[in-house]
UniProtKB/Swiss-Prot annotation:
Function: Negative regulator of class I heat shock genes (grpE-dnaK-dnaJ and groELS operons). Prevents heat-shock induction of these operons.
Keywords, in A-Z order: Repressor, Stress response, Transcription, Transcription regulation
Top-rank taxon, per record: Bacteria
Keyword Lyase found: no
Pfam families named among the record's database cross-references: HrcA
GO molecular function: DNA binding
Gene label: hrcA
UniProt feature coiled coil, ranges: none
Keyword flag Repressor: yes
Annotated protein name in UniProt: Heat-inducible transcription repressor HrcA
UniProt GO BP: negative regulation of DNA-templated transcription
Family recorded in the similarity comment: Belongs to the HrcA family.
Amino acid sequence: MLTERQLLIFRAIIDHFTWTIQPVGSKNLLKEKGLPYSSATIRNEMGVLEEYGFIEKTHSSSGRVPSEKGYRFYVDYLLQLKKLDKSDRQMIRSFFSENYYEMEGLIQNSALMLSDLTNYTSILLGPEATKNHLSGFRFVPINNFQAMLILITDQGHVDNHLVTIPEGTTLSDIERMVNILNERLVGLSLDDLKVQIPMEVKELLGKHVRNYESFMHVFSDSFAQASQQKVYFGGKTNILNQPEFHDINKVREMLHLMEEEQDVYELFRDIPDGLQVKIGRENNNSLMEDCSIITATYNIAGERVGGIVLLGPTRMEYNRMMGLVDVMSRDLTDVLTKLYRDNQN
C-alpha cells in the first residue's frame, strides 16, 4: 500500500510525535531525522500520507501528526515486537524471582511495577470472585468486646472484618461457631453463600451458640464483600499527567471512574485472549478517546483468571509497552501457577 519511502517518512513522523508531542513539517523532519530526501519530496509524500488518512493537520500548526487510522496501521502492519532492553528485563526478573506466598499481594505489586516501568496507569483484574470457594474462617478476639473475623478463599483472598461481640457471648460460643462454620461451609462458593447461609447451618448454630443471630449480618457482609470483583491499580493518576488530559472536566470524570472499581471491572472484564491494542475511539468510551489501551490475560494452571490493562496516550511507545505487557502476562502466569500448586501440596 505504501512505498518504502512513504513508510520511512511515516515511521519518522510517528517517532517524532511519540517523543515531542509536537506536529512536524517536512523541513523539521528532514533536519531532525536526516532522511535521504529533499524537503519538497518529503512534503509531497506527507501529502499522500494525509490523503490515505494516516496523518492529519492540527488546528494550531501547519505540521502533521499521526491519526488514529495511522496508529492502527502502524500497530497492525509495521510494528515488530522486539526483546525488552536489559534494564526492563532485569527489573521484571528481579520482581518475579522473589518468594510470594499470597496471590493478592503479588497481583497488586505487579500492577505497581508495570506503572513504574511505563509511567502510565496499569489495571489488573483479579480472578473472578464468584468462582472462589470458602477455604476457612478464623475468629481472633481483640478484647472482651471486639474480634477480627477473617475469611479465606481457595484463591488466596483474605477478607477481614472488625466485629462487635454480642453481650453474653463467650469465647467458647465463638469457638463452637467457628468450628461449625468451617465444618459445614468450607468448599461452598461465595456466590452461593452471599445469597443465603444453608438452613442446616443456622439450625446447628441455634443449638450450640447463644445469640448466633447477632453474627448473621456480619457473615452476610463478609461474603458479599469477598464476592466482589477485585481490581488492582498502579499509578492510578499517571494517565492524567499526560498533556492530552488538559480538560478539567475530563480529568474529574476519569478520577471518578477510577474510584468505582466495579465499573472499571465491567469496562474491561471481556478483554480477549492474547496481546491486544485499542486506539482512541475504538475504546467506545468518551473519556478514553485520547488513549490507547493494551490488554492481555493471565492464567493459573491453564485456566484464564484475570486481565492486564495498560492505559496510556495514543502516542505511546507501542513496541516497548506491548513488550512489557506481554512479558508481564507470561511471568505472572508462571508465578501464580507455581503459587497455586505449592498451596495444593
